[in-house]
Amino acid sequence: MAITASMVKELREMTGAGMMDCKKALTATEGDMDKAVDFLREKGLAGAQKKAGRIAAEGIVATCISEDEKHAVVVEVNVETDFVAKNEKFQTYVAEVAAQAVNTQAEDIEGFMAEKWALDPSMTVKEKLSSMISIIGENMNIRRFAKVSEENGIVVSYIHAGGKIGVLVDVETDVVNDAIKEMAKNVAMQAAALKPQYTTRAEVDADYISREKEILLAQIMNDPKESQKPQKVIDGMINGRINKELKEICLMDQTYVKAEDGKQSVSAYVAQVAKENNAKVAVKKFVRFETGEGMEKKEEDFAAEVAKQMNA
């Protein structure tokens, strides 16, 4: 198939590899984006993780928690400019959207938009959005929301950088006091700062681990020095790298950012607080929203540059 400039641009943003390397990878894999990423990784030309995409959209993330702290929601609402994102009217509106979403029965944005606007039942959520677009003077979009409930504990939230990042953490616990709440808040801050992909290793798909091992083996075999090592040593290298990656992408395995010794894991920190409060505690899940993740603004000049180099 024909390899287009936009395909090269997308692969470059996902991997950080050079444009011509991206074109070569796409050509070799007949335009299959996922296979092209693996191709570059095997050649040592891309990072270990796909990048979700440049953070380019404006807006804010907001959270809302029920009075009993057992139900919470995180929402993202986008606008065109950072100037409007800081506008008081816009921020008040986003808080109202979050307050509506924490009580919604809708399972997706389409259903949510069709609901009656709680503060004015004469209009729907969608109609209220249209009204706000007229008032604000910019296009706006309620992009997504996620709800978390915990009947046997609490849900806590954390907002970072004025709404750039929002996190919910589901904590199952038989003791709810200030110490447990502070621990949960610290875990939410951890998730905001270090961007884990999973709560625990148990959530990581076995096929993902298997594919990572294949890629690591290919990298080693492509290295003249490393490939000469005994198989037992190579297996140890692969398992060591996998373990290191899991410690980076799994929240409970990460090094706790406030650890006094610089070594304590999040899991160990939670266990410590639980013991100090004679409580049974389990961090069951987290949800992390970052404003604009996976979205980007148009960059016609860059696309033209890619096209020019491809046709050279």
Task: List where the protein language model places each region.
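N-terminal assembly/interaction segments in proteins that build large macromolecular machines
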Residues: A2-A312
